[in-house]
Design a protein with these regions (language model features):
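N-terminal Rossmann-like FAD-binding beta1-loop-alpha1 element of flavoenzymes
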Residues: 3-30
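Accessory recognition modules or surfaces
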Residues: 2, 6, 38-44, 48-50
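Glycine-rich FAD pyrophosphate-binding loop
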Residues: 22-44
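Dinucleotide-binding Rossmann-like beta1-alpha1 core, especially the glycine-rich loop
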Residues: 47-134, 138
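Helical element adjacent to the flavin cofactor pocket in flavoenzyme catalytic cores
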Residues: 149-153
Length: 153
């Protein structure tokens, strides 16, 4: 069997990639050891949002953080593609993006999140630091130990 592109993994990323490649005329084959979209993509916790993972920088691994930061425009493009896919297909693909929080329990962590947000915004991500009543209103389930958060809708 011949194919232009073989995609290993039939989850949300593999199937999406196959769709967009096939739409452009590429002969694509998707293989997976399970039925498509039945593992993590079909039964995940539902946290789908774009946000920089900062714990690498908090641990001093700035090189790894820089590599992730360089990929942020791709993550943003991926989010736009989900909406494009729904319009093309004419039905909801059941992908919800309700935003995400990265929390701080100390003043040092909060200052770090403020720097992180500045970098995210510079790269085109809509995010912001929330504290106090605004944070409690947004996420009343958080512990009182949380003094602030980076919220990315």
């Amino acid at each position: 069997m011949d194919t232009d592109v073989l995609i290993v993994g039939g989850g949300i990323v593999g199937c999406s990639l196959a769709y967009f490649l096939a739409r452009e005329g590429t002969d694509v084959l998707v293989i997976d050891r399970f039925d498509l979209n039945t593992q993590a993509s079909g039964t995940n916790a539902g946290s789908l949002h774009v946000q920089m993972m900062s714990f690498f920088a908090m641990e001093g691994d700035w090189e790894r953080y820089a590599r992730l930061e360089a990929k942020l425009p791709l993550y943003l493009a991926g989010g736009r593609m989900w909406r494009e896919l729904e319009r093309e297909l004419g039905f909801e693909v059941e992908v919800k993006s309700g935003g995400g929080l990265m929390v701080a329990e100390t003043d040092d962590q909060l200052r770090f999140l403020e720097k992180k947000v500045a970098g995210e915004r510079r790269l085109g991500l809509t995010s912001g630091v929330v504290t106090g009543a605004e944070l409690k209103n947004l996420a009343p389930y958080l512990s009182d130990a949380v003094i602030g958060a980076d919220f990315c809708p």
